[in-house]
Amino acid sequence: MKTATCSLLICVFLLQLMVPVNTDGTLDIIGKKKVKELLAHQDNYPSAVRKTLSCTNVKSMSKWASCPAGMTATGCSCGFACGSWEIQNENICNCLCLIVDWAYARCCQLS
């Protein structure tokens, strides 16, 4: 009985690892939240200069993904279902799990 239960738990765990993750959707949601936060704290005076927000994804085959010069990391996504990450120096995504095969950084620039 113990062997069957253990085998079942292992099968369930392996099936969870096989479920695909929609990283682009997750990064877009995080980016939109960040933009809303930035816009909520701007001055109430109309700007004479029109600003545009441009964003891109940067993929790395390691635990770190760096944004291009002049861009800021607004969110991260990590491989092997790692949900633990941090942004360092405003432009580097660092995945905090022990085993990670890729990292995405959502990089944006307001110009």
From Swiss-Prot:
As one GO molecular function, the record gives: hormone activity
Q: What's the protein called, per UniProt? A: Resistin-like alpha
Keywords from UniProt, A to Z, are: Disulfide bond, Hormone, Secreted, Signal
This protein's gene is called: Retnla
Summarize the subunit comment. Answer: Monomer.
One Pfam family name from the record? Resistin
Entry's family note:
Belongs to the resistin/FIZZ family.
This molecule's function is given as: Probable hormone. Plays a role in pulmonary vascular remodeling.
Q: Where is the signal peptide?
A: 1-23
UniProt subcellular location: Secreted
Keyword Secreted among UniProt keywords: yes
**Species name for this entry?**
Rattus norvegicus (Rat)
What cellular component GO annotations does this protein have? extracellular space
Tissue spec: Highest levels in adipose tissue.
- Disulfide bonds listed in the record: 55-108, 67-107, 76-93, 78-95, 82-97
